[in-house]
């Protein structure tokens, strides 16, 4: 979502939960990175990009519409790792893996057949509402959200700048959850540098969240 304007972008995101780590990333980023790791796929990607530009159908470009980041929650090590491509720089940022300070509410609703409860928190300068399913005993969720007694099936900030909602679930026939090594060389940076580089890359200035931590 464009938090500084009125345009909204939607993208299919993937949350994969393993015994020791979880992954969260855009499906289109994974698709493109997989293509780039194969010479034939790389040529196909180039052809798709050229066709999109020539036809001015920019929505068909084989690139992520919102984020190319990969997020990993490492349970044993207690850290969240973000792998990001900022401009031409491959970056790796590590943070402490902590839970949000959730406050449970009385509201309930059904999401994909699961009875969900409402929880609220303030995180990184925004107020969030999350709907979690107690019958799915995983204290996980999209992006950096976690720490509720059930899987988070929907979460959004109160201004609806960011909104994640479950569209499907698969439990059988999946590959083991692991770190993807699409880009072997990363520059390790801290969160403040990451936010500065992100602001510079978007050319939209520094948003309120970044100002809070600088």
Model-assigned labels for residue ranges:
Residues 117-181:
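Gly/Pro-enriched, hydrophobic low-complexity segments
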Residues 111-112, 123:
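Structural motif
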């Amino acid at each position: 979502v464009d938090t500084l304007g009125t345009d909204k972008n939607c993208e299919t995101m993937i949350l994969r939960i393993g015994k020791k780590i979880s992954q969260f990333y855009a499906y289109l980023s994974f698709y493109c990175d997989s293509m780039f790791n194969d010479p034939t796929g790389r040529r196909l990607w180039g052809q798709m990009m050229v066709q999109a530009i020539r036809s001015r159908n920019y929505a068909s470009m084989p690139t992520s519409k919102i984020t190319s980041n990969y997020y990993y929650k490492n349970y044993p090590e207690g850290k969240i790792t973000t792998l990001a491509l900022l401009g031409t720089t491959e970056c790796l940022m590590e943070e402490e893996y902590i839970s949000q300070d959730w406050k449970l509410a009385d509201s309930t609703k059904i999401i994909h057949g699961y009875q969900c409860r409402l929880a609220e928190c303030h995180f990184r300068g925004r107020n969030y509402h999350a709907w979690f399913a107690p019958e799915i005993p995983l204290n996980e969720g999209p992006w950096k959200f976690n720490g509720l007694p059930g899987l988070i099936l929907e979460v959004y900030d109160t201004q609806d700048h960011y909104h994640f909602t479950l569209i499907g679930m698969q439990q059988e026939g999946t590959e083991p959850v692991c770190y993807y090594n699409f880009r072997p060389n990363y520059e390790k940076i801290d969160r403040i540098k990451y936010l500065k580089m992100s602001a510079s890359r978007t050319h939209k200035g520094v948003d309120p969240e970044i100002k809070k931590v600088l």
